Amino acid sequence: MKVHKGDMVLVISGPDKGAKGKVIAAFPKTEKVLVEGVNRIKKHVANSAPERGAESGGIVTQEAPIHVSNVMVIDADGNPTRVGFRVDENGKKVRVSRRSGKDI
């Protein structure tokens, strides 16, 4: 998957289109990412279940995963870009910006 934890992304489709946020978690098997402040849902949590963002239960607002095709990585210039791969001189695979050609 070309989007990793810690990347800044732009949402390009859906109700939160245009929102920017940091990737909290990436789920490669389902091709989904959890973006900070995007796709927020209300979840009813029991008092005994310690969930992400829950103190003592009740109704909790938290982020839900969105599909990786609905986000674009923001490069160092602040522009949304597609991500490609290249092999560097050490034989390691590196992510590169398709817009500028620089390493991400």
Swiss-Prot record:
Function: One of two assembly initiator proteins, it binds directly to the 5'-end of the 23S rRNA, where it nucleates assembly of the 50S subunit. One of the proteins that surrounds the polypeptide exit tunnel on the outside of the subunit.
Cross-referenced NCBIfam families: rplX_bact (TIGR01079)
Organism: Corynebacterium efficiens (strain DSM 44549 / YS-314 / AJ 12310 / JCM 11189 / NBRC 100395)
Subunit structure as annotated in this protein's UniProt entry: Part of the 50S ribosomal subunit.
Single GO MF annotation: structural constituent of ribosome
Record-linked SUPFAM superfamilies: Translation proteins SH3-like domain
GO biological-process terms attached to the record: translation
Family: Belongs to the universal ribosomal protein uL24 family.
CDD domains linked to this entry: KOW_RPL26 (cd06089)
Name the record gives this protein: Large ribosomal subunit protein uL24
One Gene Ontology cellular component annotation held by this UniProt entry: ribosome
Organism classification: Bacteria, Bacillati, Actinomycetota, Actinomycetes, Mycobacteriales
Keyword line: Ribonucleoprotein, Ribosomal protein, RNA-binding, rRNA-binding
